[in-house]
Amino acid sequence: MICMHFSVLLQESIADLNINPEGIYIDATFGRGGHSKAILDKLTSGRLIAFDKDLDAIDYATHNFQNDNFEMVHASFTYIYDYCLQHNLLGRVDGIIMDLGVSSPQLDNANRGFSFTHDGPLDMRMDISKGLTASQALEELSVDELTYIFKVYGEERFAKKIALRIKGYIAENGSITTTHQLAELIRATIGKREKKNPATRCFQALRIYVNDELKDLEILLESILDVIKKGGRVAAISFHSLEDRIVKQKFTSLINPKQETNRIAKMLPQDNSQVKMKWITKKAKANQDELSQNVRSRSAILRVVEKL
């Protein structure tokens, strides 16, 4: 299957990175290389290191990116700090781009199990070489654990009801092995109460759990100050409120530390020695032209910071 993939907020994110042609850049989420290509097009003697744990992304990079100044690393972006440590790059990186969440090719490939639009095996792993599938997770998790995952990661108000139905179904009928099976079970449990598919939130929650997405994001954000140089920039594109909240809170804590402390501390003068970054773009969304080309860009939020 050939999947059309549009890199969301491409022009805005690359412009905000203010590419140095001789600089060192990291694409934390290669995907199909839209942001990587845009960065490489602006580099002369500079270099780009890209990370992705999806084997399909690695295969795509191998066949389509032969630049001498490009390196593809099959690893989660949680490995970026260790990579930079091993290659003497800590404090030398000019910019990092992270395009979070699931990519269009992943959603459109039924065999990956990310979407209820196409029936396929209930997998949902970004890296199919390891870890539990979504189907296996549903079997292993308790009702309380599933309820927590659906409520916290999916912001699903019927979390307990859905969790009970899923575990009851598994007890009576065995594994839930396909995306349509799970989506239909959720629909039958809560009905269709709004425009979007009733399975949307639970699919998001299960994917986040299977791939440990929020914990991985926190690990990456904790490392950015050590990785980039002074004047270096970090651009983060998020697609749902949980990701964006983590990005915003981390960036804010580095820009205005007193906001992250108690009420009394907020009344005190700013201690500029604690300010590590400044906003380049506090919040940007896709324009109407991009929305008309790619409906998936409607929820995207871009935030960009620079190290002081």
From Swiss-Prot:
Q: Name one GO molecular function term.
A: rRNA (cytosine-N4-)-methyltransferase activity
The organism's taxonomy opens as:
Bacteria, Pseudomonadati, Pseudomonadota, Gammaproteobacteria, Thiotrichales
Q: Does the keyword rRNA processing apply?
A: yes
Under InterPro entries, the record lists: RsmH, SAM-dep_MeTrfase_MraW_recog, SAM-dependent_MTases_sf
Q: Which residues bind S-adenosyl-L-methionine?
A: 33-35, 52, 81, 99, 106
Keywords for the protein's UniProt record, in alphabetical order: Cytoplasm, Methyltransferase, rRNA processing, S-adenosyl-L-methionine, Transferase
Entry's Gene Ontology cellular component terms: cytoplasm
Catalysed reactions, semicolon-separated: cytidine(1402) in 16S rRNA + S-adenosyl-L-methionine = N(4)-methylcytidine(1402) in 16S rRNA + S-adenosyl-L-homocysteine + H(+)
Q: What does this protein do?
A: Specifically methylates the N4 position of cytidine in position 1402 (C1402) of 16S rRNA.
Q: What is its main location?
A: cytoplasm
- Which Gene Ontology BP annotations are present? rRNA base methylation
Where it sits in the cell: the answer is:
Cytoplasm
Q: Spell out the SUPFAM superfamilies in the cross-references.
A: Putative methyltransferase TM0872, insert domain, S-adenosyl-L-methionine-dependent methyltransferases
Q: Does the keyword Transferase apply?
A: yes
Name of this chain's protein: Ribosomal RNA small subunit methyltransferase H
Q: Which PANTHER family match?
A: 12S RRNA N4-METHYLCYTIDINE METHYLTRANSFERASE (PTHR11265:SF0), S-ADENOSYL-METHYLTRANSFERASE MRAW (PTHR11265)
Provide the family line.
Belongs to the methyltransferase superfamily. RsmH family.
One of its Pfam families is Methyltransf_5
Enzyme nomenclature, EC number: 2.1.1.199
